[in-house]
């Protein structure tokens, strides 16, 4: 049984809640002692992991729609991508304002260049910014065939973002490895498409 347009609308509502509720939880945790002795790192890791979750969900949509024969699922991809960008922006903001501090924002550029894992992070964010700004139907019409080429760059983010996470942790734990493995698996599902590009 295929999903209807009405069911997709309700699914989008649920996905919006999935994007917004973690923010409410984070505010609650900040104000009610729900974070560890290093709350800045907790906020950075939470926002970064949430961005990664939405990135993986975005990458999951196409193969899921294809294998489950639910073409209307594609309509949720843009929404998931937007939430990925929102959480990636919160992640970047938490580093800039909480780690560096508002009085040291001038150091942000040098920090992003001098620390390789930060360089990967800002490249990923800039790509997400470009994809977000061109995610409208107007941009799709204006860019034509170039639109799909541009939005295929999301696969670069799928590589760089997990590496950024792996590189940023001082002690390797299962979480970043799991995210990297999931990203790799989702990229592997597109093996045939990549082969066509390389020919």
From Swiss-Prot:
Q: Which keywords, in A-to-Z order, does the entry hold?
A: Cell inner membrane, Cell membrane, Electron transport, Flavoprotein, FMN, Heme, Iron, Membrane, Metal-binding, Transmembrane, Transmembrane helix, Transport
Q: How is the cofactor bound?
A: Binds 1 FMN per subunit.
The cellular location(s) given in this protein's UniProt record come to: Cell inner membrane
Keyword Cell inner membrane carried by entry: yes
Domain of life of the organism in this record? Bacteria
Main localization (coarse): membrane
One CC-aspect GO term = plasma membrane
Q: Any stretches that span the bilayer, and where are they?
A: 10-30, 82-102, 116-136, 153-173
What Pfam families does the entry give? Ferric_reduct (PF01794)
Query: Does Metal-binding show up as a keyword for this record?
Result: yes
Binding partners and assembly: Heterodimer of a catalytic subunit (MsrP) and a heme-binding subunit (MsrQ).
Q: What is this protein called?
A: Protein-methionine-sulfoxide reductase heme-binding subunit MsrQ
The gene name reads msrQ
